[in-house]
């Protein structure tokens, strides 16, 4: 006689609401995409959004508007955890740097500090060759 296997029920763990007032906003803006991560002061992520995640595809991912929408989405999610003030760390040469910072301020977060943390090589890797269009 065959035994009937028990159904396994998986419980989805609800994200607990953290009460964090101060945090950091890490904006990584490349030539292809913009990634915004909001963290607490130790660097533990509260929320994250990117232009590609929001449905922007191809060359539209690298626009300032896409970075603005990504920053807005990440800010709203982080503000649910009680985030009020942020220190902004910007990395990369992309078009969405300033747009993302302005969007964080417009969403209601107070920006205390803006710091450029773009890594600069001391003559490391050879850069890509010039594009010929």
Curated annotation (Swiss-Prot):
GO biological process: translation
Keyword tags: Ribonucleoprotein, Ribosomal protein, RNA-binding, rRNA-binding
Matching InterPro entries: Ribosomal_uS11, Ribosomal_uS11_bac-type, Ribosomal_uS11_CS, Ribosomal_uS11_sf
Highest taxon in the source lineage: Bacteria
Coiled coil: none
Any one Gene Ontology cellular component term annotated for this protein: ribosome
Signal peptide start and end residues: none
A single GO molecular function term of this UniProt record: structural constituent of ribosome
Gene3D superfamilies documented for this protein: Ribosomal protein S11 (3.30.420.80)
Database matches in HAMAP family: Ribosomal_uS11
Subunit (UniProt): Part of the 30S ribosomal subunit. Interacts with proteins S7 and S18. Binds to IF-3.
PANTHER family the record matches: 40S RIBOSOMAL PROTEIN S14/30S RIBOSOMAL PROTEIN S11
Protein family per UniProt: Belongs to the universal ribosomal protein uS11 family.
Function per UniProt: Located on the platform of the 30S subunit, it bridges several disparate RNA helices of the 16S rRNA. Forms part of the Shine-Dalgarno cleft in the 70S ribosome.
Name of the protein in question: Small ribosomal subunit protein uS11
Organism of derivation: Alkaliphilus oremlandii (strain OhILAs)
Upper taxonomic lineage: Bacteria, Bacillati, Bacillota, Clostridia, Peptostreptococcales
């Amino acid at each position: 006689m065959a035994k009937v296997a028990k159904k396994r029920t998986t419980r989805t763990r609800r994200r607990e609401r953290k009460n964090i007032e101060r945090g950091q906003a890490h904006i990584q803006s490349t030539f292809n995409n913009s990634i915004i991560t909001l963290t607490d002061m130790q660097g533990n992520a509260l929320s994250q959004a990117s232009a590609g995640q929001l449905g922007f595809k191809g060359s539209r991912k690298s626009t300032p508007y896409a970075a603005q929408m990504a920053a807005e989405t990440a800010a709203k999610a982080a503000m649910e955890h009680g985030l009020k003030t942020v220190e902004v760390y910007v990395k990369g040469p992309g078009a969405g740097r300033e747009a993302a910072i302005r969007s964080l301020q417009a969403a209601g977060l107070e920006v205390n500090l803006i710091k450029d943390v773009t890594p600069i090589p001391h003559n490391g890797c050879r850069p890509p060759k010039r594009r010929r269009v």
